[in-house]
Amino acid sequence: MEFNGTEISTDAQGYLTHLQDWSEALAGEIARREGITLSEAHWQVIHFVRAFYLQYNTSPAVRMLVKAMAQAYGEEKGNSRYLFRLFPEGPAKQATKIAGLPKPVKCL
């Protein structure tokens, strides 16, 4: 993937292969390619999954993401309907991709 004149290494599905390549600007480009216009709600989830990864060294699958979001932000944001509205192709799949993280293990 080329971004700002630099080749960024990704796997076959477009996930970054090097976490240190991530930036908010690159996240915006990945989101654009995913057909998502990032809002403050998207950024909250993106920063949440990055913090989750740094703490647990794993990208959260949907069930884990919903549970952790509910604990952190309450049931309004910690439910799959809310997350799927933000990331229609799958909150774990798209949020982790935009956040520059590896694809969750239990993600199809």
Swiss-Prot record:
InterPro entries associated with the record: DsrC-like_C (IPR042072), DsrC-like_dom_sf (IPR025526), DsrC-like_N (IPR043163), DsrC/TusE (IPR007453)
Pfam families: DsrC
Domain of life: Bacteria
Enzyme class: transferase
A single GO cellular-component term on record: cytoplasm
KW Transferase (keyword) present: yes
Tagged with keyword Transport: no
Self-association and partners: Interacts with the TusBCD complex. Interacts with MnmA.
Described purpose of this protein according to its UniProt entry: Part of a sulfur-relay system required for 2-thiolation of 5-methylaminomethyl-2-thiouridine (mnm(5)s(2)U) at tRNA wobble positions. Could accept sulfur from TusD.
Primary residence: cytoplasm
Active site per database record: C107
Localization of this protein: Cytoplasm
Record SUPFAM superfamilies: DsrC, the gamma subunit of dissimilatory sulfite reductase
Keywords, in A-Z order: Cytoplasm, Transferase, tRNA processing
Gene: tusE
GO MF terms held by the record: sulfur carrier activity; transferase activity
GO biological process, any: tRNA wobble position uridine thiolation
Family: Belongs to the DsrC/TusE family.
This protein's name: Sulfurtransferase TusE
Enzyme Commission number, as recorded: 2.8.1.-
